[in-house]
């Protein structure tokens, strides 16, 4: 007899699996391969690289790798040809048991960019396992009283294969008493068994030896067999019968040991020992069931014995056998199916699959940083996992596909603000109560050179005394770069430019690493008062970033120049001046005037005059103005006074220590009468008024024409130079509306003034003249240019004797002495509040931009008011003289329009300045002997102006 069966339930599962595959596979997007089990090492599985659309050359650079939750050594990929091959023995039964489907799930991961592919390799079953019985021999005890068609259960064979390979066909050796019976329902309540076809007779046949052979459906067929030893017994002809043939129980997982699962009950119609039933597990029960459950042999209670885990096994099938105590025991059988209910007892599991660290701070938003896989062994809502990040991080999670998240950049990074982030990923399932797990990763932000070196302030002011030693350290600049490593390494350098005819690098240098600024040569205040330059700071990044800082180096004056006497007339040198004075002059008559200039500035250039006693002079006869240098009589002269007076005038500055020079004035007293070279003012006023007016008009016209021509020529030359040369930054100082002045007592600022310096491309800046302006504009259209007081040899140049204002005024104005007097002396530390008299202009009220220096504070009273902008609307006509004149040595403003007896103007009261007088002299020299008298009158006017 032959019967083919694989259990009805397994047949249904197999059919459903085939239908599911037929429907699902066309829509599946992942790669699918199929290989038989027990394939040899190196067996070709598939060209995985080609199927995934990857080039062979990019497998290694993109870090092609294969990961598997199953045994990772079963399959391998050859990176040289992209072929997936069998790496080790694959036993389907070991890998998947009796599951209808068996697949190896692979995850193929490549970087740059990050990609994940799913590969499923189906392991096909082959007929490599023969069917086997639990034992090689089965003993059966059958009472002879058993009726025909009685069913005697047999333990069936098992085949580890599946499908057709597991379809078993049983065959019983030929006999007269028994036949094989297959199950009558799909739940396998009745399994394989023997059916009694002929009544037994113990006396005739006490024992029967049968062979049960099983054959599977594979190709080739494999067989197994068991020997059946049937012993014919007597009496006890009723076997135990269970209340139900099938018990179904639901049991939560994680229940404690001893928990009652179910109680089975079987009854036996026999009496006595033949009716007492003992319960036990069937002999063919799996060891796993024996480890998890225990049955009480008397009561039939089944209790939990081991750890019940839903994730390990979702259901248990227990075969229970009830045997009576008769001499010929009879048995009954039932089945208990324990269905394990899942509870939320597993927290989610997190794993970082791939990390791309560190991340550059300029990475674009959306950059993938890591791939995170999540897994929860629970089912249903207990296994539904959601992931989130800790707040305040510039990242977010993006669900790419089931159970996978990508950690991507959500906002811009700034390493200088935050150098690294600790990212904590929280995975939480949907159970109640919910379980959660965390995984953290430290994301380091790589620096990018996005910050230039920064100085604490855009400009620094440095004060350095002149005559410094070469290589002196004058300042240190420092810039800070917020970047790191080589992007924060700052080096310093000069922004090269020309200072006059020389390069800036010949004056100063900067140390590339420390930022120290050194003066390469001694600085001279008289040559260069302000040195303005820029220092550049650049980092070592690629590309390098940099910034500049401006340094204004003010060279402070030291008293290193002695006063220098100005020669009053050509041909007279050695500091000796000769003058003729009539004995008829009265007290206060100005005999001579000593003029000196000091190349220094401030108090170092503030000159004072003192008359020293010497042999042959009467000190009480003359006196000298303390700050004007004017020598005047103290009384009327008489016959008793010596005809020759030798005066020694000591000129010294106010430096510390003070420097001085001595001038000698020889005064000759003559009797009353006309002087050869110095006619009196009264006579000159009476006799030469008309000629003076004519000469003045002519000279004024000539001077105006000459100055206009010179101005046009200068503008043309300046325009040509500006068009042909690259403009460079002026060395005359910063275009700031604040002037910083230096002196022996310190430095200060004078607001609402602008210092005008005359710059030349060939010579050092001119420093003889300074103008003041109420305007804060940077216009330099009005620049005054005067000759330098010293030549290249260092000796004082001979000044133009026609300048009719004191050289000490020029030095004082250049060094802002009037500012010292108006500021420091007025409210200086430790000194009284002094009010210095001020010489005003000829205008009724000062105009805008008009500044007058104080009188008597080291500034000559012949100083004139500098202004630009509209002047006095009242302009003198041709031949007219100004209404007021500044008397040397006096703070008063004296009108010089004094009407004489004949209503004529005395030319000697008019003091000329600068080029007008020089033009007049040149004109007179051209006239020769014909205009000798006019020349003498002009010289007389000059002498009177000096006085």
Swiss-Prot record:
Region (Disordered): 761-805, 824-853, 897-947
InterPro entries (UniProt xref): Cadherin-like_dom, Cadherin-like_sf, Cadherin_CBD, Cadherin_CS, Cadherin_N, Protocadherin/Cadherin-CA
Topological domain ranges for the Extracellular compartment: 30-697
Region 6 X 4 AA repeats of P-X-X-P, residue ranges: 734-891
Signal peptide per UniProt: 1-29
One GO location term (cellular component): synapse
Tissue note: Detected in brain.
Disulfide linkage: 96-102
Record text about domains: Cadherin 1 to cadherin 4 domains mediate homophilic trans-interaction, the interaction with an identical protocadherin expressed by a neighboring cell. This is a head-to-tail interaction, the cadherin 1 domain interacting with the cadherin 4 domain and the cadherin 2 domain interacting the cadherin 3 domain of the other protocadherin. The cadherin 6 domain mediates promiscuous interactions with protocadherins on the same cell membrane. Each cadherin domain binds three calcium ions.
Name of the protein in question: Protocadherin alpha-4
Gene symbol of the encoding locus: Pcdha4
């Amino acid at each position: 007899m032959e019967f083919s069966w694989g259990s009805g339930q397994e047949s249904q599962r197999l059919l459903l699996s085939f239908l599911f595959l037929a429907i699902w596979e066309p829509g599946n997007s992942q790669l699918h391969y199929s290989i038989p089990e027990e394939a040899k090492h190196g067996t070709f599985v598939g060209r995985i690289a080609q199927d995934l659309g990857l080039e062979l050359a990019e497998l290694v650079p993109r870090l092609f790798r294969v990961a598997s939750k199953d045994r990772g050594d079963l399959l391998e990929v050859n990176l040289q040809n992209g072929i997936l091959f069998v790496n080790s023995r694959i036993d389907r039964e070991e890998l998947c048991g009796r599951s209808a489907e068996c697949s190896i799930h692979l995850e193929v991961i490549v970087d740059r960019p990050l990609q994940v592919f799913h590969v499923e390799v189906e392991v096909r079953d082959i007929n490599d396992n023969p069917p086997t019985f639990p034992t090689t021999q089965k003993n059966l005890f059958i009472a002879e009283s058993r009726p025909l068609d009685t069913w005697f259960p047999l333990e069936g064979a098992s085949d580890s294969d599946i499908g057709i390979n597991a379809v078993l066909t049983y065959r019983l050796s030929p006999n007269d008493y028994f036949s094989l019976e297959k199950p009558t329902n799909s739940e396998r309540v009745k399994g394989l068994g023997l059916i009694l076809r002929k009544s037994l007779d113990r006396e005739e046949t006490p024992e029967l030896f049968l062979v049960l052979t099983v054959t599977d459906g594979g190709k080739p067929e494999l067989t197994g067999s068991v020997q059946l030893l049937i012993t014919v017994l007597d009496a006890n002809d009723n076997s135990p019968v269970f209340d139900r043939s099938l018990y179904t129980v639901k049991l939560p997982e994680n229940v404690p040991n001893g928990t009652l699962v179910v109680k089975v009950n079987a009854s036996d119609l026999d009496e006595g020992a033949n009716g007492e039933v003992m319960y036990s597990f069937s002999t063919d029960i799996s060891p796993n069931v024996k480890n998890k459950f225990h049955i009480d042999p008397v009561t039939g209670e089944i209790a939990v014995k081991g750890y019940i885990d839903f994730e390990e096994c979702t259901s248990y099938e227990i075969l229970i056998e009830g045997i009576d105590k008769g001499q010929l025991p009879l048995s009954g059988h039932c089945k208990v199916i324990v269905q394990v209910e899942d509870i939320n007892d597993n927290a989610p599991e997190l794993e970082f699959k791939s990390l791309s660290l560190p991340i550059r701070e300029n990475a674009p938003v959306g950059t993938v940083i890591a791939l995170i896989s999540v897994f929860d062994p629970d089912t249903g809502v207990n296994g539904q996992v959601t992931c989130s990040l800790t707040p305040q991080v510039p990242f977010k999670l993006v669900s790419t596909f089931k159970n996978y998240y990508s950690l991507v950049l959500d906002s811009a990074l700034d390493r200088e603000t935050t150098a690294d982030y600790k990212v904590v990923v929280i995975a939480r399932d949907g159970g109640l109560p919910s379980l959660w797990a965390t995984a953290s990763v430290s994301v380091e932000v790589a620096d990018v050179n996005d910050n230039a070196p920064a100085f604490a302030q855009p400009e620094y002011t440095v004060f350095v005394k002149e005559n410094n030693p070469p290589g002196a350290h004058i300042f240190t600049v420092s810039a800070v770069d917020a970047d790191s490593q080589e992007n924060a390494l700052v080096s310093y350098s000069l922004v090269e430019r020309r200072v006059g005819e020389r390069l800036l690098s010949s004056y100063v240098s900067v140390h590339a690493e420390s930022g120290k600024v050194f003066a390469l040569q001694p600085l001279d205040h008289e040559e260069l008062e302000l040195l303005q330059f820029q220092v550049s700071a650049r980092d070592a990044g690629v590309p390098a970033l940099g910034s500049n800082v401006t340094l204004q180096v003010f060279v402070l004056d030291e008293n290193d120049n002695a006063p220098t006497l100005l020669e009053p007339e050509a041909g007279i040198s050695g500091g000796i001046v000769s003058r003729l004075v009539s004995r008829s002059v009265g007290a206060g008559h100005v005999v001579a005037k000593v003029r000196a200039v000091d190349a220094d500035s401030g108090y170092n250039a503030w000159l004072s005059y003192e008359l020293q006693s010497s042999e042959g002079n009467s000190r009480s006869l003359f006196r000298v103005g303390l700050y004007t240098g004017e020598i005047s009589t103290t009384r009327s002269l008489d016959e008793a006074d010596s005809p020759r007076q030798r005066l020694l005038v000591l000129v010294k500055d106010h430096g510390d220590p003070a420097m001085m020079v001595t001038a000698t004035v020889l005064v000759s007293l003559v009797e009353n009468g006309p002087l050869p070279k110095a006619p009196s003012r009264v006579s000159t006023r009476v006799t030469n008024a008309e000629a003076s007016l004519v000469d003045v008009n002519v000279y004024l016209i000539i001077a105006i024409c000459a100055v206009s021509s010179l101005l046009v020529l200068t503008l043309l030359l300046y325009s040509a130079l500006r068009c042909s040369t690259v403009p460079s930054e002026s060395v005359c100082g910063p275009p700031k509306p604040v002037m910083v002045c230096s002196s022996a007592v310190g430095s200060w600022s004078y607001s609402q003034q602008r210092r005008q310096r005359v710059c030349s491309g060939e010579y050092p800046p001119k420093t003889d003249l300074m103008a003041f302006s109420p305007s804060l504009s940077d216009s330099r259209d009005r620049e005054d240019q005067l000759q330098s007081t010293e030549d290249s040899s260092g000796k004082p140049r001979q000044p133009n004797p026609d300048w009719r204002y004191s050289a000490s005024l020029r030095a004082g104005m250049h060094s802002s002495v009037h500012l010292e007097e108006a500021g420091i002396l007025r409210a200086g530390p430790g000194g009284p509040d002094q009010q210095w008299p001020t010489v005003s202009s000829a205008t009724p009220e000062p105009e805008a931009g008009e500044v007058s220096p104080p009188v008597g504070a080291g500034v000559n009273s012949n100083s004139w008011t500098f202004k630009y902008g509209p002047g006095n609307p009242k302009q003198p006509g041709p031949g007219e003289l100004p209404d007021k004149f500044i008397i040397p040595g006096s703070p008063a403003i004296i009108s010089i329009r004094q009407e004489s007896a004949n209503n004529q103007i005395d030319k000697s009261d008019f003091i000329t300045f600068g080029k007008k007088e020089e033009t007049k002299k040149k004109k007179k020299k051209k006239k020769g002997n014909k205009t000798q008298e006019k020349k003498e009158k002009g010289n007389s006017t000059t002498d009177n102006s000096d006085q």
